[in-house]
Swiss-Prot record:
Record keyword Iron present: no
Its biological purpose: Transcription factor that binds to the octamer motif (5'-ATTTGCAT-3') and regulates cell type-specific differentiation pathways. Involved in the regulation of keratinocytes differentiation. The POU2F3-POU2AF2/POU2AF3 complex drives the expression of tuft-cell-specific genes, a rare chemosensory cells that coordinate immune and neural functions within mucosal epithelial tissues.
Keywords, ordered alphabetically: Activator, DNA-binding, Homeobox, Nucleus, Transcription, Transcription regulation
Source organism per UniProt: Rattus norvegicus (Rat)
Gene name linked to the record: Pou2f3
Protein name: POU domain, class 2, transcription factor 3
Pfam families the UniProt entry points to: Homeodomain, Pou
Amino acid sequence: MVNLEPMHTEIKMSGDVADSTDARSTFGQVESGNDRNGLDFNRQIKTEDLGDTLQQSLSHRPCHLSQGPTMMPGNQMSGDMASLHPLQQLVLVPGHLQSVSQFLLSQTPPGQQGLQPNLLSFPQQQSTLLLPQTGPGLTSQAVGRPGLSGSSLEPHLEASQHLPGPKHLPGPGGNDEPTDLEELEKFAKTFKQRRIKLGFTQGDVGLAMGKLYGNDFSQTTISRFEALNLSFKNMCKLKPLLEKWLNDAESSPSDPSASTPSSYPTLSEVFGRKRKKRTSIETNIRLTLEKRFQDNPKPSSEEISMIAEQLSMEKEVVRVWFCNRRQKEKRINCPVATPVKPPIYNSRLVSPSGSLGSLSVPPVHSTMPGTVTSSCSPGNNSRPSSPGSGLHASSPTASQNNSKAAMNPSSAAFNSSGSWYRWNHPAYLH
């Protein structure tokens, strides 16, 4: 009987901790001879209860600080939360755990001595301690306000649980950028085609945007946008403005009767005049103008007006056509040619006695091939014997000899004998 009863109580004590009260009541009804065994069982119950509570506290340790204060009464919560608020801020950072435990042990009030075993075990579990997310962090901060009562904390806790976390911003290499780049490239190509079709230059677009929308852009900026040479950020800023201008420019000529605001000038006022398109004249009209040009190449203003009325053309177009046709006629009839040098003739050599004779001119040595000889007669001027030589008898040496012969008639025969005669004459012998 004595041996079976302790076995029965041990089986009941190894179960759930909640059965400890039943074990105590049954143990009180045991005989007086088993008092010593009852004391041992009571100690075993207390140790098992303490072990279970320690396991529960260790398993729920990350949420211990944020959930523990909510179970306190409303009067005691304000003071306890004020002291736990710096504790929460310090425990959230894993790098300061060893210093935090010593600091908290020195400043913990008497009512919170139960937290000391948990704080002492923090340095051994640094690897398992994680930073809380946005929701629990906001919850603990809302609980830590000293001025709030227990009833007023509930809406703050509910609101903090529904707060959205930080949105993920796509990086520069995300999936959205290629789509935007394709759209920008397509818009730039379409914008250029529609701008040329409307007859506006890049400078006109920049000037119009400055007057219409207050953002003045240069011709270079519009050109770089069409060539996709701007940065992605600048092109994204410029696209809506250009798109708005393009829509206004296309809707303006199609609906001229539409009323525009007084603060917005019309496109004709902005641009002054569009780029004039190339004039195309039909074949029959061109033949008529050619016939009129053959009759009168330079008509007057009245005649130009009459021709323009007959052909249903603008007067300025007819005037410009006649001006261009005259310039074309000058290019056809007066080609540019190199000027021809006039021939150089030798002076006549006349003897003082009046007798007509021919004087032989010594040959002139030159670097050009061929020699030129000329004969002087009263009725014939000296000309080059060969047409391809291009060298006349008016070289400096020949002219000097001719001048000497004309000035000194007595020495004409001497000079006409040539250099060979002078060097072989007895007077030159030394």
